Every structure is written in C-alpha cells, then in structure tokens.
Amino acid sequence: MQRSDPPRPLLEMRGISKTFPAVRALAGVSLTVHPGEVHSLMGENGAGKSTLMKILSGAYQADPGGEILIDGRPISIDGPLAAREAGVAVIYQELCLAPNLSVAENIHVGRELRRGNGRRGTIDRAAMARGCQDVLERLGADFGPNTLVGTLSIAEQQLVEIARAVHTRARILVMDEPTTPLSSRETDNLFRLIRQLRAEGLAIIYISHRMAEIYELSDRVSVLRDGAYVGTLERDALSAERLVGMMVGRDISGFYKKAHAPYDPGNLLLSVRDIADGARVRGCSLDLHAGEVLGIAGLVGAGRTELARLIFGAEPRVRGEVTLAGKAFAAHSPREAIDAGLVYLTEDRKRQGLFLDMSVRENINISVCGRDARLGALDLARGAQRARDAIAALSIRVPHANVNVGALSGGNQQKVLLSRLLETKPRVLILDEPTRGVDIGAKSEIYRIINELARAGVGVIVISSELPEIIGVADRVLVMREGRIAGELGGRTDAPITQEAIIALATGSRTEASAAH
C-alpha cells in the first residue's frame, strides 16, 4: 500500500535572519506549517519567537537572504497590510482592540463599509453588523456585533480578535500566549475553537510556555534557541525532558523533581486559624512546617491570592489568628511581615513588585538598603556587590547590574524580584504564581531555588494555576473553593496529589472527606 504524500506546506519561512544594532535576533531560521495544523513554537524568552512572528506579520523586515513562501510562491511582506492580504493574522498577548468601538467596528477596522462615494462616504454600521453576524455565530459568541468591546471580558475580546481574523479570511493564525489571562473554563472554550479552526483548514502557529497546552493542542512543535532553529518534533515524539533539553541546550532530567528532604511534621513554622476578610476569604486554616513546600490550588476567584495577602498583612482581616514560629503574628503592613521573616512574592510583578524604571541593583537592594546606611549615607559598593552576588546565585541574564529591570525578560524580572525577597532572609516565603509568563529555563531555576530554600529549613507556600507545577513541587496541596479550604491532598492524608483530585475538589465534585479516603 502506497503512503499518500504529505500536504503541500501552506507557509514556508526559509533562512530568516534579523539583526538589530549589536544584536543578532535570528540566524537563518526556517519554519514549515501545513494547512489544518496546530504548529507550536517554543523557546526561552529571547529565543527569537516573537521576532520571527513579527517578520511574518510585517511588523519587522527580515535581513536580505531569506524568503517567505505561501502555497509554494515567494511573497514579500513589507508591512502589516501586506501580511493581511497574504492571509496572515496575529493575536498578541496585548489585544489590539478599540474598547470604545463596537464588535463590528473592531472586526472591520481598516476595511470599513461605507455608503455612497468610496472613502468619503459615511460608515455603514448596519452593514458591518450584518456582515460579521454569521462569523460570530459560527464561533459561538454569546454577544452581538453592536456590543461595545469595552464591556466584554478578556476571553470575549480575544474571541473578537479571532472573529476578525476569520472575517478577513486569514489562512494563517498566530496566537501568542493566548491563555495567560484566561480561566480554566475560558481556556477550554479557546481550545475548542482552535480545534474547530484547525478542522476548517487554518494553519495555526501557537506560542506558549505551558507544557500541558503544548501536549493537548500540537500536531508538531518547533523549538528556537538563541535565535537559531533547533528542530521540530512530531506529536508522538513529545516529552517534557526532550523539549526542555532542546530549549535550554542541556539535559534537565526530573523537571519538577523534589530535591529536598521530607519535612518534619513536628517543626511547625506557621499556623493560620479561621482567617477571613469578610468577602473573598471565609475562614481558612493551614499549617506550614519548616522545610515544607505547601501548594495552594483552586480555580480563578477561589481566594488564593486574597488568603496570601491576608497572611502577609497586605489586607486587613476581620477575624482569625496567625502564629509564626510559636508567637502570635499580626502584621499591620508588609514591612512588619518582612521584618518578622515572612515575605510574599506577588502574582503581578510589574505593577506590585518591581520598580521598572529602576536598575537591577536598586531593585535587589531596596528592601535591605537600611543595612548599608553609614552616617546617613548608603554604602553603594556594598549594595553593588550584593546585586552581583544575587545575579550569579539566581543566574539572572543581564549584561550588568545597572540595566533597568523594565528591559529584562519576564523570567529575569521574576528572578530579580525573588532575589530581593531572599535578601531579607525569610523564614516563610509565599510565592504567588511564581512562574507565570516565564520561560522553561527560568522555571527550572525557580524550582531549584524552591528546593534549596526547603533544604535550608524555609517554609514555602506556592500558589499556582499550573497543576503539573503544583503536583511536582509540593509536599502537600490545599485546594480552595469559594474562599474556603475544600480539601487537602498528600502529606499525612491517604489522598494522592493528582490533577483529577485537585479539579474535583476545586469544582465541588469531591468533598474533603472523600479526598482523604
């Protein structure tokens, strides 16, 4: 029996290079994508993924020597309009929509329908609404074409972007980290839509750092590293170890490996009893032991972050008791908590954690600069050495300590923030979504740091929406639902820590009693 020939590629990018002043972002990268395929693109931050896609979208011009082919024909993409005419649409992490315009107006932007005399005619909003109604229905939208975009949720706005791509008859759809702002239910809906578009013959280039998404969606995965093409894996050949090794250029066996000794249940470090804020947290209790990594899981809105901020003292509590190292603890501010040895890494590093217009050195030292004061002046040399030591210890990729934090990748920003917290010598460290938006290499570094802290006797609480992460790093897992602790997995219970058990507790289909037996 003869095997059928594979379909002709819809997109071929051959030998694509891009040089910026003093930096070569891409070096002869090639990528082939077929119709009806979800082709994932992976690599660490700075690997060249975004640059390659910006060349495809017309935002950047490639260096001479490479070529782009669609349906086997070379084309020139010299700007976003040329990309759109070639059938390319890109949905970025930051959605490109006008919130004060309707859904129909956003879908038709740059292609407005007019009455009368060409471009001088008045915009025909009714015709635009009629023209995109069928696309919205086809994609399962539960809002109409005249809905104001600013009133929609992030997931619904993302659907508007997809509708715009479909309406322009895009054949190649690029999606850059599309699930970052979405809940698990919204993510499931997005995946359903992606499969629908794939079945209709679209070629989808999917960029993500999340392994579970890559496994679930991908037909093939291509990996970039340091601006160069490393290779492409078929779906059947995918494994976390192989992908990570391709991305970082070295073997990372046991990606989530617990490399610390079992904690001592008799060495209680933090005790929380019946803590509540009167709204999102409704009476939670937990224990954390020295050398333990405690995971907190739950759906978006379950109250995980609010619980962490209550313990830390960033929000007032209406009731409850907290004991730290055997002493009553009632921080009225984050400063008091830090001085007592309890620190919190926020889930929103850019708005609540980092000073983006300040240097790496300043960000690392800002929580402990009082130690360096001599006769009212800061010891800058001591602060500079502290920053250099932190950069080396956490493998922060930065040319020097005086570069602004805002110029760094997400993973390096996270490590700067983490290094600042570690300079306070904490006894308890609460990490809220510690690997959100960071690449695989940075994730492995953060997991290494968590293990080192646990080995040193620090109690670590990890809040994460990535279930493989929670399962991989935590000794025990508490699952929250609607502001309460719904159940405990692992530890002294008989309930194993599994994705199914976490989801069951988080959604209410499993009770605390059934989780423990």
Curated annotation (Swiss-Prot):
One of its GO terms (molecular function) is ABC-type D-ribose transporter activity. SUPFAM superfamilies: P-loop containing nucleoside triphosphate hydrolases (SSF52540). Keywords: ATP-binding, Cell inner membrane, Cell membrane, Membrane, Nucleotide-binding, Repeat, Sugar transport, Translocase, Transport. PROSITE patterns: ABC_TRANSPORTER_1 (PS00211), ABC_TRANSPORTER_2 (PS50893), RBSA (PS51254). It is found in: Cell inner membrane. It is a peripheral membrane protein. Its main location: membrane. Belongs to the ABC transporter superfamily. Ribose importer (TC 3.A.1.2.1) family. This is Ribose import ATP-binding protein RbsA 2. It comes from Burkholderia pseudomallei (strain 1710b). The lineage of its organism: Bacteria, Pseudomonadati, Pseudomonadota, Betaproteobacteria, Burkholderiales.
